[in-house]
């Protein structure tokens, strides 16, 4: 590869302040000048290319505009001593494909690299970046954004539908475009009663089976479904249907395909310098060097890019444990302690605090959610109070315990009663989201309905029981696509969900109907979401009835005027004349019953009011006597 003796670039349109803040790690809009941008210099229109490669000897831009030839005029020039390179190419234009040819200064070895800041890329297996300057879109979601800025999600409903775009639905066996999805997805989510959709990663990734969690193009919209404008149109349509959009975001590690970020200038650049810290053996990826200023700029600017350019309402941050712990998924001897001898990743902790601090300061109403499975404290505590600053944390403990419980034969559930009650011991330590995500319905774990115990009737009943219990449990909610109609096969990323079963089988149609009614019930009852993180909002009636495997508890609204009594029967036994303590004297009415005939249940519902009597029970001065249907959740409400 030819070496070019570079000279200081005097024609760069990049401001000195931008350069300063970029190298200081404080620039949060680096995408505005890094990568490929339309420019007019000396009266000539073209594209200015800028990248960061501190150990490069030379960088040449090749592409459609120069027939992919290395030419002297297309070599970048260094604009700082810290590795910022730039060049203006007059005849480059929107839609041209390009790559960087990066030569290392010590070895003279060169590699062909995609642009880390490219806004669009070729569909796999091709790997070139694509100049994308026509990204303007006229949004129509002003009312949504105004509402978002004023919303406190802690005391509002939040019921999330997690979605993998490529396999939700296909068209003639092919990926649906963002525009095609705009015609069906918003309406479906609205009709089903979900408040938010959570997209699994939408940035470019080479391997379909990675589901987007091993990205190469952090700024590149997933080209499988169309272009930038198409995605903006989809988000706009969702917002106009009062549906929030959360994006899975992967700031901890990246794909090690050679065209990507790995050894970008021939040396560790975006990854840690220490090989042991850089290598992520578990996932076959490289870990970001979260202590390096330019890497922090790359990532925090990326978060800002998705939020500002695509009006994303929240980021679910993937694999937070991998960011927090130096010894995450590593044996002794495979990790390097921090300067104090501990296993905490000090750079990762600082990065997460800075990320959340920036977003809180600049993006009103945008939420961040931690996918984190350890007992690290104060994840959802504000940064100024010593926490990491996330708004929410997935409750992985609740998920693991309750899925284990619901898979047990009811005969043995009484010996494992703590699995279904333990979550309330620690619930108020974080702002939890109860999540049944994609990770729980793949790799031999079975689909959600297939995790349920028993024959077909009991599986459907168990699913209704479990989901009703989940709706009653404090915390926001998340469910993965396909669970809402009881798909029996595990999720497969290479094919669409089995929607045909809804038309073919009454049981699946009834299950879909159940989820819609349950979601509507959740949304309409303030007691179910107004005090999720306030002790006032939840009270046990009886948490200790392990012998009958029955749970009972109260959910209350802020003003205490709305109270719901949940009774969950985790056995296939009908209980007659069951005495239950209640907080208030008066008349109680059934407002939800998962055993309803319209859901596919046995139809053991209470059509008449139930009057309390002045008899002590479960620590209350009043009690009611009820019939509890089998494998069902019963919800009562005081009406007078």
From Swiss-Prot:
GO terms for cellular component: cytosol. It catalyses: Transfers a segment of a (1->4)-alpha-D-glucan chain to a primary hydroxy group in a similar glucan chain. Its EC number is 2.4.1.18. Keywords: Carbohydrate metabolism, Glycogen biosynthesis, Glycogen metabolism, Glycosyltransferase, Transferase. It holds the Pfam family Alpha-amylase. It is an enzyme of class 2 (transferase). It comes from the Bacteria. One of its GO terms (biological process) is glycogen biosynthetic process. GO terms for molecular function: 1,4-alpha-glucan branching enzyme activity; cation binding; hydrolase activity, hydrolyzing O-glycosyl compounds. Pathway: Glycan biosynthesis; glycogen biosynthesis. The active site is at 318 (nucleophile), 371 (proton donor). Belongs to the glycosyl hydrolase 13 family. GlgB subfamily. Catalyzes the formation of the alpha-1,6-glucosidic linkages in glycogen by scission of a 1,4-alpha-linked oligosaccharide from growing alpha-1,4-glucan chains and the subsequent attachment of the oligosaccharide to the alpha-1,6 position. HAMAP family: GlgB. NCBIfam families: branching_enzym, PRK05402.1, PRK12313.1. Monomer. This is 1,4-alpha-glucan branching enzyme GlgB. It comes from Francisella tularensis subsp. novicida (strain U112).
């Amino acid at each position: 590869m030819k070496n070019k003796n570079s000279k200081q670039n005097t024609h760069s349109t990049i401001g000195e302040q931008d350069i300063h803040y970029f190298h200081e790690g404080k620039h949060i809009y680096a995408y505005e000048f890094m990568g490929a941008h339309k420019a007019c210099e000396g009266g000539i229109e073209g594209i200015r290319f800028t990248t960061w490669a501190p150990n490069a000897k030379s960088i040449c831009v090749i592409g459609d505009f120069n027939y992919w030839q290395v030419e002297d005029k297309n070599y970048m020039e260094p604009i700082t001593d810290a590795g910022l390179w730039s060049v203006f190419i007059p005849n480059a234009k929107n839609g041209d494909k390009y790559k960087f040819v990066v030569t290392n200064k010590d070895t003279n070895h060169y590699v062909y690299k995609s642009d880390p800041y490219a806004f669009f890329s070729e569909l796999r297996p091709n790997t070139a970046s694509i100049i994308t300057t026509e990204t303007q879109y006229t949004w129509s979601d002003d009312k949504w954004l105004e509402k978002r800025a004023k919303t406190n999600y802690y005391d509002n409903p939040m019921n999330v539908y997690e979605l993998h775009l490529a396999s939700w639905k296909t068209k003639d066996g092919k990926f649906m475009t963002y525009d095609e999805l705009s015609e069906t997805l918003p309406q479906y989510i609205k009709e089903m009663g979900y408040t938010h959709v959570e997209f699994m990663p939408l940035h470019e990734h080479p391997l379909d089976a990675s589901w987007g969690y091993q990205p190469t193009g952090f700024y590149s919209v997933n080209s499988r479904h169309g272009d930038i404008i198409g995605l903006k149109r989809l988000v706009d349509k969702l917002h106009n249907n009062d549906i929030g959009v959360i994006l899975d975001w992967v700031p901890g590690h990246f794909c090690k395909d050679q065209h990507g970020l790995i050894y970008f200038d021939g040396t560790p650049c975006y990854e840690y310098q220490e090989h042991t810290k850089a290598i992520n053996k578990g996932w076959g990826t490289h870990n970001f060097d979260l202590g390096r200023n330019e890497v922090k700029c790359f990532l925090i600017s990326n978060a800002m890019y998705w939020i500002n350019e695509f009006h994303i309402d929240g980021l679910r941050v993937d694999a937070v444990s991998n960011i927090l712990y130096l010894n995450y998924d590593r044996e002794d001897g495979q990790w390097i302690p921090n300067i104090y001898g501990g296993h905490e990743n000090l750079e990762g902790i600082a990065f997460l605090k800075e990320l959340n601090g920036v977003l809180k300061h600049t993006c009103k109403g945008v939420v961040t959610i931690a996918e984190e499975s350890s007992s690290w404290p104060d994840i959802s505590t504000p940064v100024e109070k010593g926490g990491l600053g996330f708004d929410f944390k997935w409750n992985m403990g609740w998920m693991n315990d309750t899925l284990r419980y619901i898979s047990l034969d009811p005969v043995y559930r009484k010996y494992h009663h703590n699995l279904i009650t333990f979550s309330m011991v620690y619930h108020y330590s974080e702002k939890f989201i109860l999540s049944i995500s994609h990770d729980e319905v793949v790799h031999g774990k079975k689909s959600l309905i297939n995790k349920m115990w028993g024959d077909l009737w009991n599986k459907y009943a168990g699913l209704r029981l479990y989901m009703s219990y989940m709706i009653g449990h404090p915390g926001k909610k998340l469910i993965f696509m396909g669970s809402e109609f009881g798909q029996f096969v595990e999720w497969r990323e290479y094919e669409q969900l089995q929607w045909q079963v809804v038309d073919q089988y009454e049981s699946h149609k009834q299950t879909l109907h159940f989820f819609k009614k349950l979601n509507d019930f959740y949304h309409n009852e303030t007691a179910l979401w107004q005090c999720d993180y306030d002790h006032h909002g939840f009270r046990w009636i009886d948490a200790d009835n392990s012998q009958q495997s029955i749970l009972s508890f109260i959910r209350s609204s802020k003003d205490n005027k709305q109270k719901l009594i949940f009774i969950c029967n985790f056995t296939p036994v009908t209980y007659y004349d069951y005495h239950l303590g209640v907080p208030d004297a008066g008349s109680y009415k059934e407002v939800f019953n998962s055993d309803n005939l319209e859901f596919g249940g046995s139809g053991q519902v209470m059509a008449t009011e139930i009057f309390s009597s002045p008899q002590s029970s479960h620590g209350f001065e009043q009690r009611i006597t009820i019939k509890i249907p089998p494998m069902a959740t019963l919800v009562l409400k005081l009406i007078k």
